[in-house]
Amino acid sequence: MCNRFYISLILINTLLFNQPLLAQQGDYLSGEVGIGLGAAHYFGDLNTATQLNRPKPAATLFFRKYLGRYIAARAGFSFAQLGYSDIYNTQNEVQYRRNLSFNTNVWEVTAQGDFHFFKFLPQERGFNFTPYITLGAGLFSYDPYAYLNNERYYFRELPVGTEGQNSPLYPDRKMYGTTALSIPFGGGFKYSIGGGRLNLSFEVLHRFTNTDYLDDVSTTYVDPNAFPKPPGGISVAQLLSDRSGDIGAPIGLPGRQRGNGSKQKDQFVTAMVMISFNLMSYKCPSGD
């Protein structure tokens, strides 16, 4: 009886006092789930100088799966507001007189690969910080709009687009869609906090896209006869196509360049502060 009692005490002592050590020895980082908040900025036909003077809000949700100490796969779902106006192009007289503007909401899903420069072990001092780079592919939705007389108009909902889309005078110009592809590329750094359970990160992610119509501006001005004529007035599409007359003499002559002619697709960038919760595993990782 006494032997059983002593054996029980030894087992209890082993479990109580050695369990944290065993857990730490077996713990390793298997993944992260987190959120991020920050700012987004657009680059394209209305912002050819790549100015960073009109940031708008952005947010993200993500899951990261570690494939080793240095490599991880990430899935993300992000939102960004984008917009710009020619009134900010004070150093370029032609663009300033063009007087175009746009806004759009972007919803994006991405798959990315992350590479850490340092071994990242959140619970070990000296290994709880690393810079990283990331590259991936994404799909996003967008639907640009502008305001006219304090009313919002979505460009795609107009019977004829601002560059003659859907007009029989320009049969080669089809209305653009609401989805496009992106290639996100960027980097950041992260630091483990909260005893190794949380990570605080800062990341800059630039997107190259395959559309030149984030801003509804790409090719040339069109013949005013391409736009339907409402009784006693000018159509909304025609007014939004050439807004130079709002601030001076109209410059939108048919055939004159309105955008950059698709020489370079539109782009956007996000900068975010992110916090994530570490998902731990007790199975030994495949490698260091």
What are these regions (language model features)?
Residues 23-66, 266-272, 276-282:
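Short glycine/proline- and aromatic-enriched beta-strand/turn motifs that initiate or cap beta-hairpins
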Residues 27-33, 69-71, 107, 125-131, ...:
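Outer-envelope beta-barrel architecture signal
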Residues 42-48, 83-88, 122, 142-147, ...:
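Outer-membrane beta-barrel proteins
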Residues 43-49, 94-102, 120, 169-175, ...:
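Extracellular loop and loop/strand-boundary signature of outer-membrane beta-barrel proteins
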Residues 70-73, 120-121, 196-198, 281-285:
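Repeated loop/turn-to-beta-strand initiation elements of outer-membrane beta-barrel proteins
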Residues 71, 76-158:
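Gram-negative (and chloroplast) outer-membrane scaffold detector with strong preference
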Residues 139-264:
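Outer-membrane beta-barrel transmembrane domain signature
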